[in-house]
Amino acid sequence: MSEFSQTVPELVAWARKNDFSISLPVDRLSFLLAVATLNGERLDGEMSEGELVDAFRHVSDAFEQTSETIGVRANNAINDMVRQRLLNRFTSEQAEGNAIYRLTPLGIGITDYYIRQREFSTLRLSMQLSIVAGELKRAADAAEEGGDEFHWHRNVYAPLKYSVAEIFDSIDLTQRLMDEQQQQVKDDIAQLLNKDWRAAISSCELLLSETSGTLRELQDTLEAAGDKLQANLLRIQDATMTHDDLHFVDRLVFDLQSKLDRIISWGQQSIDLWIGYDRHVHKFIRTAIDMDKNRVFAQRLRQSVQTYFDEPWALTYANADRLLDMRDEEMALRDEEVTGELPEDLEYEEFNEIREQLAAIIEEQLAVYKTRQVPLDLGLVVREYLAQYPRARHFDVARIVIDQAVRLGVAQADFTGLPAKWQPINDYGAKVQAHVIDKY
C-alpha cells in the first residue's frame, strides 16, 4: 500500500487476505449496542464475560427468546463477535476462564453510527469548527514561515491530514445522518397522514418544525465559520505556490477546499429540498381539509342514523324565503308591480336622466367662475344650490355640484397642508370641508 492512498486492487487483496466479513442480524446488532452502552459506563473500557452474558440476557428478554439456552447462545454470540473483529478477547494464565473484552475500532465505529452520531448538537459542531479554525490558523502561520521538509510535514501536513480532514469527515458524516433522519421523518409523517390526518396535523407540524430548525442551525454554524476556514486554506495554498516539492500539501489543501465547499453547499441544498417537502405536506393537508368537509358531515349523519334506536334524535330544518338584493345593478325596477299603471303625465322618470340634466345645468352655471377668474367658495355655492331643492335631493345635488366644481380648478391652499374649515350647507346639519378654488 502507498503512504497516502490505496488503489482498488490493493484494498480488495487486503480484505481477502484478512478474511473480513460482517453479519449482524437485528438481535446481534442490539447485543452490540447494549455492550457499547454498558462499556461507556466503565472507566477502564473493559468488560468481563459475565457482564456480556448479562447484557445478552437483557436483549434475549426483549426479543422474547427462551431463557433455557441463555448461556450457550450468549457464548456463541460473543465468539461470533470476536471472529468478526467487533470484540477483542484478552485472557491470562492467572485468571483462566475469566477473559476480558474490549470493543475494537470497528465495533466502536458501528455503535457510534447508531448511537452517538445520531444525536445532533450545535454545541458539538461549534466546538469542532473552533478546533478546525485553530488548527488551520496554526498551519497557515507555519506555512507562511516556511522551513525544511520536516517542518512542512510536522507543522502543516500532519495537522491538515490527521485533525482537519478527520473533523471534516465527521461533519460530513453528521450531514449524511441528517439525510437519513429526514427520510425517517418523511416516513413517519406519511404513516401519520395515512392513519388519521386530522389527529396527525399537530404531530406533523412538530416533526417538520424540529427538522427545519436542526437543518438551519447546522447550516448557520457552517456558514459562520466557512469564510474563515477558506481564508486559511488559501493562505496555505499561496505559501506552497513557490515550492515545487510541496505538491502533497497542495493536493491535500485542494481536497480540503473541495470537501468544505461540498459540506456547505449540500447543507443549503438540503434546506431547500426540505422547504419544498414542507410546502408539499402543508398543501396536502389543506387539500385534505377542503375535500373532507362534506365527508365529515356524511360520516356523522351515517353514524347518527345507525345509532338512531339507541340514541333517538329529531331533525329540524328551515326553508326560509329567498332574500333579494335590492342593490343588484342588473335588476330592473318593475313599476307596475309596485304602483300599478300610471297616467302618461305621471310616467316615472329615472333619476339618471334627471342627474344628467342637472349636471349639465350646474356645469354651465359654474363655468362663469372660470371665465371671469373669480374664486369659487364651494361652501357658499353648494348652500345656494341646495336651497333650491327639497331635502330628499340634497345629497345628490351636493355631489353633482362638488364633482363639477373640482373639474374647473384647484385650491392653492390645498398645497399648504392645512385643513379647511367646515361650512354648513343646509339647515339640517350637513357640512362641507373645502378650500376656495382660485386656480383654474
Curated annotation (Swiss-Prot):
Cellular localisation: Cytoplasm, Nucleoid
Region feature (Leucine-zipper): 208-236
Keywords: Calcium, Cell cycle, Cell division, Chromosome partition, Cytoplasm, DNA condensation
Superkingdom of this protein's organism: Bacteria
Any one GO BP annotation for this protein: DNA replication
GO cellular component labels: cytoplasm; nucleoid
Descriptive protein name: Chromosome partition protein MukF
Lineage: Bacteria, Pseudomonadati, Pseudomonadota, Gammaproteobacteria, Enterobacterales
